[in-house]
Swiss-Prot record:
The active site is at E43 (proton acceptor), K112 (proton donor), C152 (nucleophile). It comes from Pongo abelii (Sumatran orangutan). One of its GO terms (cellular component) is mitochondrion. Keywords: Acetylation, Cytoplasm, Hydrolase, Phosphoprotein. The modification N6-acetyllysine is found at K68. The lineage of its organism: Eukaryota, Metazoa, Chordata, Craniata, Vertebrata. The gene is NIT2. This is Omega-amidase NIT2.
Length: 275
């Protein structure tokens, strides 16, 4: 398939888990009726975002929320990137994305490897590591193209995107919830940088903005092409963002500016230490 439609669901998150899941499934169905073949939910789609919420809302995978995602992926015959949920496993908590195929099978599970610990004086202090543990593995899976997964803060680490490109990824998806400090400064910049550096499509799915929340998400779910152009971008409100992923266009860009062939592997390397 030379091109396919991607949909990003910028969901308004409430404190009621079941409502979040039900509404997410409704938007997934709507996206499928509009021709989306791959659909992504935002980071922490089933719960408020915050260290005090992660233990309360944590689930096993498979579990109640991911079972609903499996069912709707099969119903709609789509690839579904399940944003992320707080996952509990063996006494530890993770920020985890589950991916489902068109037959409802669990294709992949990715645990955020770079935890969001920052301190910007007078602006924001946040430590995911207070309650979460980091993952320790990469995640790629095959759809109409090969997809690489990261979650939010992972996008700041160029090495992750480079390794995904080396592994043949043509689309990188980052469910994420930047904030009102980092969002306006870095959200689009990082996406365009990752896209141009690695000649890939980059997509981000954010929660919709809720100014009354303890953590206010930036919103602006986005799709960027390998030329660094913004193809589609939401505002701050609840929305579905659609974009056609053109693999022929990607191949043309890689042929026109052949950086992969021109890398000086005799002088430098970015390598994967662990599969």
């Amino acid at each position: 398939m030379a091109s396919f439609r991607l949909a990003l669901i910028q969901l308004q998150i409430s404190s009621i888990n079941s409502d979040n899941v039900t509404r997410a499934c409704s938007f997934i169905r709507e996206a499928a009726t509009q021709g989306a073949k791959i659909v992504s939910l935002p980071e922490c789609f089933n719960s408020p975002y915050g260290t005090k919420y992660f233990p309360e809302y944590a689930e096993k995978i498979p579990g109640e929320s991911t079972q609903k995602l499996s069912e709707v992926a099969k119903e709609c015959s789509i690839y579904l990137i399940g944003g992320s949920i707080p996952e509990e496993d063996a006494g530890k908590l993770y920020n985890t994305c589950a991916v489902f195929g068109p037959d409802g099978t669990l294709l992949a599970k990715y645990r955020k490897i770079h935890l969001f610990d920052i301190d910007v004086p007078g602006k924001i202090t946040f430590q995911e590591s207070k309650t979460l543990s980091p993952g320790d593995s990469f995640c790629t899976f095959d759809t109409y193209c090969r997809v690489g997964l990261g979650i939010c803060y992972d996008m700041r680490f160029a090495e992750l995107a480079q390794i995904y490109a080396q592994r043949g990824c043509q689309l990188l998806v980052y469910p994420g919830a930047f904030n009102l400090t980092t969002g306006p400064a870095h959200w689009e910049l990082l996406q365009r940088g990752r896209a141009v550096d690695n000649q890939v499509y980059v997509a981000t799915a954010s929660p919709a903005r809720d100014d009354k929340a303890s953590y206010v998400a930036w919103g602006h779910s986005t799709v960027v092409n390998p030329w660094g152009e913004v193809l589609a971008k939401a505002g701050t409100e609840e929305a579905i963002v659609y974009s056609d992923i053109d693999l022929k266009k990607l191949a043309e860009i890689r042929q026109q500016i052949p950086v992969f062939r021109q890398k000086r592997s005799d002088l430098y390397a970015v390598e994967m230490k662990k599969p």
